[in-house]
Design a protein with these regions (language model features):
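Conserved small-residue
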Residues: 1-552
Length: 555
């Protein structure tokens, strides 16, 4: 399955006030919606793909039609203006809207709970009735809920059929927490790209490790204010693979090609029905041959498989409702029947950055001396001095690094392009003023802790070697699991730089205890088994790093 080059899709985004002002019976044309910024772009998702399937809407034909319409539009615009050409341009735009706009799917932004209660009774847009479909976790934070057409213009009972498919024929006798179930079901609305089905899937229990460590215990059960107590030798339980799974290099290679990635992906964020998490590339078949000396494994339902017939391993923390199905075959068959597919929301890079900007939270708890501060700000000050000194190449790098979504993106991009074409523009008054504005912003940001440092943001995964020891039931004691010891992490980027210690931060931070100094380690064994993971932090399963980083997990 090749990565789909889908055209831009759009949906209506209405406010609850607007719908209620129209007495829950809105009449609006697409052009009016566009003019009022009520027609918004929407990334492709499983839910949108299902809507197209239910409507018997063929995307390949639609893509060809869109290409033809765009080409015709270009050709007409080259011709002299005329009434006929103007009329045809309008017809082309209408035809493109019919393809792009998904009128079965409407998002509503709520002003109040009362509005929410009222609109959940139903409302109409252009004569079509809509019912509440789902609230995604991110959408709920922004008071936004997704509604679906009850019966659409194609006479399809969309709400009923889409709701049925999203439930994926799960065992409805299983008790669920409503809020969690809503979040699990909403995974179908994540922006994603479909990929091919793996050749063999294994679902296993999470790896739960127990050890003793020093902790700070907070208890607010019996008092108005929390009581803090330090415990030196506390019992700690850690899920080392919370939201994490494994894929064979063969599967990673195939998915990399399907996602048009020009390297072997080390990790990606995966979706399917009630399934979410990060899968990392690890040759668990080789592990079976060389370490476990075994090729049979047992899944969470008690079924036995040959590991050489498995390409993807999911954990129970990834497949949220695994116990609502009788086996992996039962789950996959129901996914096929309801048009669920595996899809990828993000492919992680194979190289990490050399430099990043600090967040003020990361340094606010430090008691820094003047000498420490001078050392910390040195890279930022040097960069500003280089630009003020007129260094052409460093000015270009500075400007590219200063461009983000909050700073005149398109205009600054044009300035950079102009400088690349004509370096002498560095002496132009307008360019000089523009650079000075950027420098002033850089200085203001530096004052609140946005400082350039050697570092990067990096995804974390639990030790896949330890997970495989668990999968193959090797009987290894908790304190011997994995290749990493307490206080250690593996990171190829820092190993290649011969760095032996890093400081780990994760926003948002609440106290200095959220900061951890970790050893960067390596060995021939680690280099071999972690060879497909060049740009991730591999965590040990013997310390409280995840707890210290505000409950960090691996998905």
């Amino acid at each position: 399955m090749a990565k789909q080059q889908i055209y831009q899709q759009r949906v209506l985004k209405l406010s609850s006030e607007y719908i209620l002002w129209n007495k829950k019976d809105v009449h609006i044309t697409l052009q009016e919606a566009r003019d009022d910024q009520k027609l918004i772009p929407l990334f492709d998702s499983t839910a949108i793909r299902m809507i197209d399937i239910i409507n018997e809407f063929h995307r390949d034909i639609a893509c060809e039609e869109m290409d033809k319409l765009k080409q015709e539009l270009k050709e007409i615009r080259r011709k002299p203006k005329s009434h006929e050409n103007k009329k045809r341009i309008s017809e082309i735009y209408k035809a493109m809207d019919d393809i792009q706009c998904k009128m079965d799917y409407v998002t509503v932004v709520f002003k109040s709970k009362e509005d929410f209660d009222e609109l959940n009774k139903g409302f109409k847009v252009n004569g079509i009735e809509y019912h509440r479909l789902i609230g995604t976790p991110n959408g709920v934070k922004k008071s936004t809920i997704i509604y679906c057409a009850v019966k659409n213009k194609y006479d399809k009972f969309m709400y009923q059929e889409l709701s049925r498919r999203l439930n994926n024929n799960r065992d409805e006798t299983k008790e669920l927490v409503p809020a969690k179930f809503e979040a699990h079901k909403a995974l179908a609305c994540s922006a994603s790209t479909p990929v091919s089905t793996p050749n063999g899937i294994l679902v296993v229990d999470d790896l739960i490790v127990h050890f003793k460590d020093k902790i700070i215990y907070l208890n607010d059960e019996d008092t108005d204010e929390p009581v803090m107590k330090e415990i030196d030798n506390a019992d700690v339980e850690l899920n080392i693979c919370d939201g994490g799974g494994l894929m064979m290099p063969s599967l990673a290679s195939r998915w990399s090609e399907e996602m048009h990635v020009n390297y072997l992906m080390g990790a990606c964020c995966l979706r399917n029905s009630f399934c979410k998490g990060v899968v990392s590339t690890f040759d668990f078949q080789a592990f079976g041959r060389e370490v476990a000396h075994c090729d049979t494994v047992t899944d969470v339902w008690g079924n036995v498989y040959n590991i050489n017939n498995i390409e993807l391993i999911l954990t129970t923390s990834m497949l949220k409702l695994w116990d609502s199905y009788s086996s992996i075959e039962d789950y996959l068959n129901k996914c096929i029947n309801n048009d669920f597919t595996f899809s990828i929301t993000k492919v992680y890079p194979n190289e990490l950055e050399e430099e990043r900007n600090l967040n003020y939270q990361f340094i606010q708890s430090y008691n820094l001396s003047d000498e420490d501060i001078m050392h910390l700000i040195s890279p930022t000050v040097s960069e500003i001095k280089d630009v003020l000194g007129g260094d052409y190449y460093k000015t270009l790098l500075f400007m590219k690094g200063s461009v983000d979504e909050n700073y005149n993106g398109a205009e600054d991009d044009n300035v950079i392009k102009s400088l690349m074409i004509a370096p002498e523009l560095l002496q132009d008054t307008y360019i000089i003023n523009r650079i000075h504005n950027m420098i002033n912003k850089k200085i203001d940001d530096a004052k609140i802790g946005t400082l350039k440092i050697k570092g990067n943001y990096c995804v974390v995964i639990g030790d896949p070697y330890a997970l495989c020891q668990h999968i193959f039931s090797m009987g290894i004691s908790d304190d011997k699991l994995g290749l990493l010891k307490a206080g250690e992490i593996y990171n190829k980027h820092w190993n290649d730089k011969q760095v032996n210690q890093v400081v780990c931060f994760r926003a948002p931070m609440s106290c200095h205890n959220n900061i951890r100094k970790m050893k960067i380690v390596n060995s021939d064994e680690m280099s071999y088994w972690y060879q497909y993971l060049p740009a991730v932090n591999i965590l040990n399963c013997h310390d409280t790093l995840c707890m210290a980083e505000n409950g960090m997990d691996t998905d």
